[in-house]
Every structure is written in structure tokens, then in C-alpha cells.
A protein has these predicted regions:
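Bacterial Sec-dependent N-terminal signal peptides
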Residues: 1-39
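A generic structural signal for short coil/turn motifs at secondary-structure boundaries
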Residues: 30, 68-69, 263-264
Length: 293
């Protein structure tokens, strides 16, 4: 009998607890609904982020100056990326005549990553393309006696595409706030970043930029594989500062392994550079057609 009463009391306590949770949930929902209906969101707040035209492309030649980047037998990354960037600029201006190209680097100077992002954000770029060359670190080989020897690893081959990692979204939010939310030409009024409307707009920008970054990387990856017959290591997330601080869709293109002799020859050849450029332009055309449809 005592056990039966104990079980009944436990059941009643659980029921009481569930009812209290239900009441709190309903009250919270009503509060959020009331609050959401009371703030004055700017006209077509979310729709503003969906108005996308590919008008300005930012071309970023990786490294420069004393930051030479990866190196091969006879060439260094900073020179190869600048050569490809110049070719890409000319190709875009020729084949996409209504698109403006902004270069983050045109000389052999060391441009800090924040300056590159500032150039891109000041130009109100619609997409950021950073050109790089990949490389593998030396392997450590241990002999039978225990002696360690560094051996060059020349086995790397193919392209790799990087988009910003989710762990750096706070930095992206700051770039969007400074570049997009403060732009009175895009908004009916300057929005307080703490306002719920600004939060909605911020999330919509982040969603759009993320989606378009991954989409452009996917198109580009497919072009490299199917049209150029190149090996690809796919698309990866990485906390690259220049990508996270650019308030726009952004992709870093590792065009090949410069410390692989065959890849180094390809990256330094006119044929190889022209093929890389043509692939990027095709991907841009596809993206432009999709987003402006």
C-alpha cells in the first residue's frame, strides 16, 4: 500500500513538473511573438539581401614581398599567383564586360590580410577569389640507428578549394556589420546592430554568403575535374583570415602543388595558367547565370 501511494505521488509530481514546463513554454512563446510584432523592421529587410548581381569580383594574388609563400625547385608562390591573377583580371574584363575587377595586389609587395579584406570590402565586392599554390611539408624519416632525416615530400597533386570555417563567424559578422549594415544606400535607415531586425538581416547575409561560397566552390571543383581532368582534394572549411574578414562570398583556390616537379611546370606554363584562368571564368559565368536568373 505504501509503495502504491509512493508511485502515485511520483506520477503526480512528474505531471505537475510537465505542466509547469508547458506553462513556461507557452508564456515564453507569447512574449517572443509579442516582441517580434512590436519592433519596426525596415521595409523588405530580408529581401534586400536577396538582390544579388555579380558586378564586382575581387581577385587576390596570395603572398607577396618577403612573404614568398610555398616554393618549388625554381619558382615561388607569390610570383605564380600574381601571374595567374593578372591573367584572370584580363579574362574577366574580356568575357564578362559588365563585371568590374578589383585586385588586392598588383606588385611584389607584402599586403597584410586585413588590408586585402579592407580593399575587398571598400569595393563592395560580390565575390572574393584568392589565388594560392599548395605544398606539402617534408617527411621525417628515422633510420635504424634512430637518426632523423628530412625528406622532401613531392607527392602532392591537384587542386583544393577552401571556404571559411564556422568557428570564425564572429569575425565575418563584424565585417558584414561594418560593410553592409552601415551602408545607407542599401538600407532605408541605419540599423542598430542590437535591434532584432538587424539580427535577422545579419543572419540572412551570413546564410547567403555561406551558400554562395560553397556553391561557387562546387562549380569550380566540378570544372577542374570534368573539363580539365585535374585531380581535386575537394572543398574544405578552414579559418583563413582573409576569407572570414571579407563581407561577401569568398573562396581560396589552391591551384596546385608547387613543390611537385610536374605541378610546378604546369603552374608556371602559359598553358597551365591559361587553363586555370579559363576554368575560374567558366565557373563565374555559371554562378552569374544562376544568381541573376
Amino acid at each position: 500500500m505504501v509503495n502504491q501511494r509512493s508511485n502515485i505521488m511520483k506520477t503526480l509530481n512528474r505531471l505537475n513538473y510537465c505542466l509547469r514546463l508547458l506553462f513556461i513554454s507557452i508564456a515564453f512563446f507569447c512574449f517572443k511573438t509579442s516582441r517580434a510584432s512590436n519592433f519596426n523592421a525596415p521595409k523588405d529587410t530580408v529581401n534586400q539581401t536577396n538582390k544579388f548581381k555579380l558586378k564586382t569580383v575581387i581577385v587576390d594574388a596570395g603572398h607577396g614581398g618577403f612573404r614568398t609563400g610555398a616554393s618549388g625547385k625554381y619558382s615561388v608562390e607569390k610570383n605564380v599567383t600574381l601571374q595567374i591573377a593578372f591573367k584572370l583580371q584580363k579574362a574577366i574584363e574580356k568575357e564578362l564586360s559588365d563585371v568590374k575587377v578589383v585586385m588586392t595586389r598588383t606588385t611584389d609587395d607584402d599586403i597584410l590580410w586585413q588590408k586585402r579584406s579592407d580593399i575587398a570590402n571598400d569595393a563592395k565586392g560580390d565575390i572574393f577569389i584568392s589565388i594560392h599554390c599548395n605544398s606539402l611539408p617534408d617527411r621525417i624519416v628515422r633510420s635504424a640507428s634512430g637518426k632523423k632525416t628530412r625528406v622532401a615530400n613531392r607527392s602532392g597533386k591537384g587542386v583544393l578549394l577552401l571556404v571559411y570555417g564556422f568557428h570564425r563567424t564572429k569575425e565575418e559578422e563584424k565585417a558584414i556589420k561594418d560593410t553592409r549594415l552601415s551602408d545607407e544606400e542599401e538600407m532605408d535607415a541605419v540599423i542598430d546592430p542590437n535591434d532584432p531586425a538587424a539580427m535577422i538581416l545579419m543572419n540572412e547575409y551570413k546564410r547567403k554568403y555561406r551558400k554562395q561560397s560553397v556553391r561557387f566552390a562546387s562549380i569550380l571543383n566540378q570544372e577542374f575535374i570534368e573539363n580539365d581532368g585535374r585531380r581535386s582534394e575537394g572543398i574544405r572549411e578552414q579559418g583563413v583570415l582573409v576569407l572570414c574578414h571579407s563581407a561577401m562570398p569568398a573562396v581560396l583556390v589552391e591551384t596546385g602543388y608547387i613543390n611537385n616537379p610536374d605541378e610546378e611546370d604546369y603552374l608556371n606554363s602559359e598553358e597551365g595558367q591559361n587553363q586555370i584562368v579559363a576554368t575560374i571564368v567558366r565557373a563565374l559565368k555559371t554562378l552569374k547565370t544562376e544568381v541573376e536568373a
